[in-house]
Every structure is written in structure tokens, then in C-alpha cells.
């Protein structure tokens, strides 16, 4: 098996078919002829990524498809224009994610899965922009590693996966666990149904995916954190998964002002910045304290100077929070 590589080492080449000429009415981009391929960099056009043949037509799901989708003149360095409400967006992280995904496909490894059938998508066209991206666990325990499902935020107006779930999943994979990023319909109820469907899909295909289903976790930022809390607390079956689908061992939540408790909430880790104008750290702290008072294991962190949507918190006081969260989850399994 080919080793996986970081963006600094990856020799991933964009398709020789060239750069984007235009966009069709359904949002699918086309190719222009004559441009040379090159390595993934900050200057790589986003549409070159979307239309890369290695991505088999689902490249569009790497980026927002609803609110502020990318335009044909944007490069990876322009991604922040597509991600309202987010901060600490690092182009190097984006390049790392794209390089990883293309290198996986170049090595003929599958990482995208439809969670709905063709018949279901034909009956409900909104399901076309859903799916599950897998970042496979690396290291000796990869063949039997546990899994986490990460839901990006976006205010239930779009899915900010390239900043708020893909980097998390890649970090988890490099830490020896399976990370799955769900691309969902931007509506609170439908998003939870898509997350529950993703969880049941993983359980149903556990052997094919080589994952350990015991003690899994749900992660999310902002709106995605609400999804993790709702599906984690009420259980996947409450949102359409088969009856008996287990609840997660832990919910990992970033920057959400949610304060709803279900009475069956899993162990919960939460973090937020003290300058978040969307999710009050005091509200989050009060929620975690109330949950802890019921005997549920909790851990809470507030980071000085950070605003909403800091993702991995690269080069900030929050950097490394994901390793703390991973340790918290493992302690609950």
C-alpha cells in the first residue's frame, strides 16, 4: 500500500484536461483545453479541483454548493470568501486536504460514499448534494480503528467542510482513527437525518470500511455541533436510523450556543473562543456544567482572543485542542 503523504511531500498533479472554462446551469463546471497540469498550491483554481477526473464528479461537494459557492476565478487561497462566519482559515490546511484526497484517488483508494441510493436521489433531488468522505486511519491499528463522524457548520445555510470537518478528519486519520465527514442538506432536521443515515451506513458497511463500531463519536462545529448534540442525545434512531443503532460514546462540540439537554446525552467535550459573537462561551459553559451535574463526563475549554469558527485553531492558543478532544473520547470508549 502506498504511504499517505502531507501536502509538503505530495506529488499530486491536477488533471491534464486543464482549467475551467465555465459553469453549467446545474453548477457543474466544464474544462478548457490547453493549460498545463501542476501541483496543488494556493494558486490552484478551485474549479480545477472540483472538475478533477480523479474525483469522479463529486468534487463539487468539497466546497459550498448553496450559500456563497466558489466562482470560476477563485483559487484555493480565496476560500475564505466562501466561508462566512469562519475565522483562522489557513490556505496551507486547504492545500493539505486537497493534496491528500487526490493522492488517495491516484492510489485507487475509495474515500467517497453515497449514503442514499440512486432511487432515493431520483425521488428527492435534494439528496444529490449529500455524501460521506472517509479519511482512513493510518498506522498499525488502522484496520480495526474506531470511527468519528464530523459535521461541519455553516448556519444550516451551507456546509463548510473544507475548513470545519475535512481538516479534523485528516488529523484524526493521522492520529490512528477513522474520520468521516458528512455532507448534509442545510436544514436542521434534514441535516440530522443525513447524519443519522451516515452513522447507519457506517454500521452496515463496517466490514467493508474496516472500522470498529464500538464507542464511536460525533463531532461538529457551530451548526454541526448542534447536529452532534441532537443525534448524540436523542440517538440516531430518532432521525431515521434503524432502531437499535447505538448512541455515540462521546460528542465533541465547537462553538455552539446550544443549551438543550435530552436526559440521555453522551459524554461531551466542548470548546469556544471568548470573543465569539455567535456562540457565547458563557452559554456553553453553563450547558456543560448542567450536564456535568447529572453525572455525565464533560470537558470545557474557552480560548482567549478567538472568535467564531476557528477550526483546528492552527497558530492560535487553541492549537492542539483536537488532541485533547481525541483523548477525552478515547477515555469514554
PLM ranges: what are they?
Residues 275-279:
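Acidic catalytic loop of the alpha/beta-hydrolase fold
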Residues 162-179:
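Short amphipathic alpha-helix adjacent to the substrate-entry channel of hydrolases
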Residues 1-15:
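N-terminal secretory signal peptides and thylakoid transit peptides that target proteins
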Residues 145-153:
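Short beta-strand element of the alpha/beta-hydrolase
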Residues 14, 23-131:
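N-terminal targeting or regulatory segments adjacent to alpha/beta-hydrolase or S9 domains
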Residues 197-264:
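Primarily recognizes the serine-hydrolase "nucleophile elbow" in alpha/beta-hydrolase
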Residues 270-272:
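Short beta-strand/loop motif that positions the catalytic acidic residue
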Residues 296-333:
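C-terminal catalytic histidine-bearing segment of alpha/beta-hydrolase fold enzymes
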Amino acid at each position: 500500500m502506498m504511504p499517505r503523504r502531507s501536502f509538503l511531500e505530495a506529488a499530486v498533479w491536477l488533471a491534464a484536461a486543464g482549467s475551467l472554462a465555465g459553469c453549467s446551469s446545474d453548477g457543474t463546471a466544464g474544462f478548457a483545453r490547453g493549460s498545463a497540469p501542476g501541483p496543488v498550491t494556493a494558486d490552484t483554481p478551485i474549479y480545477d479541483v472540483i472538475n478533477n477526473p480523479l474525483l469522479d464528479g463529486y468534487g463539487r461537494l468539497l466546497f459550498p454548493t448553496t450559500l456563497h459557492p466558489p466562482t470560476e476565478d477563485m483559487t484555493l487561497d480565496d476560500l475564505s470568501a466562501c466561508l462566512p462566519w469562519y475565522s483562522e482559515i489557513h490556505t496551507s490546511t486547504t492545500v493539505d486536504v486537497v493534496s491528500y484526497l487526490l493522492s488517495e484517488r491516484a492510489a485507487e483508494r475509495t474515500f467517497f460514499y453515497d449514503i442514499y441510493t440512486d432511487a432515493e436521489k431520483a425521488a428527492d433531488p435534494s439528496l444529490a448534494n449529500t455524501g460521506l468522505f472517509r479519511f482512513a486511519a493510518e498506522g498499525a491499528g488502522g484496520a480495526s480503528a474506531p470511527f468519528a463522524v464530523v459535521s461541519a457548520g455553516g448556519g444550516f445555510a451551507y456546509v463548510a467542510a473544507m475548513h470545519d470537518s475535512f481538516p479534523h478528519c485528516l488529523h484524526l486519520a493521522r492520529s490512528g482513527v477513522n474520520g468521516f465527514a458528512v455532507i448534509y442538506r442545510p436544514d436542521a432536521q434534514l441535516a440530522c437525518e443525513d447524519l443519522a443515515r451516515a452513522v447507519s451506513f457506517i454500521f452496515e458497511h463496517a466490514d467493508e470500511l474496516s472500522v470498529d463500531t464500538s464507542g464511536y463519536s460525533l463531532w461538529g462545529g457551530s451548526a454541526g455541533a448542534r447536529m452532534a448534540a441532537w443525534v448524540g442525545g436523542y440517538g440516531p434512531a430518532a432521525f431515521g436510523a434503524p432502531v437499535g443503532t447505538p448512541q455515540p460514546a462521546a460528542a465533541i462540540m465547537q462553538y455552539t450556543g446550544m443549551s438543550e439537554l435530552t436526559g440521555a446525552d453522551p459524554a461531551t467535550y466542548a470548546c469556544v473562543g471568548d470573543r465569539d459573537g455567535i456562540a457565547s462561551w458563557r452559554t456553553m459553559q453553563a450547558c456543560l456544567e448542567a450536564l456535568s451535574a447529572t453525572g455525565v463526563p464533560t470537558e470545557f475549554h474557552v480560548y482567549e482572543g478567538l472568535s467564531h469558527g476557528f477550526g483546528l485553531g492552527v497558530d492560535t492558543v487553541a492549537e492542539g485542542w483536537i488532541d485533547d478532544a481525541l483523548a477525552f473520547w478515547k477515555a469514554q470508549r
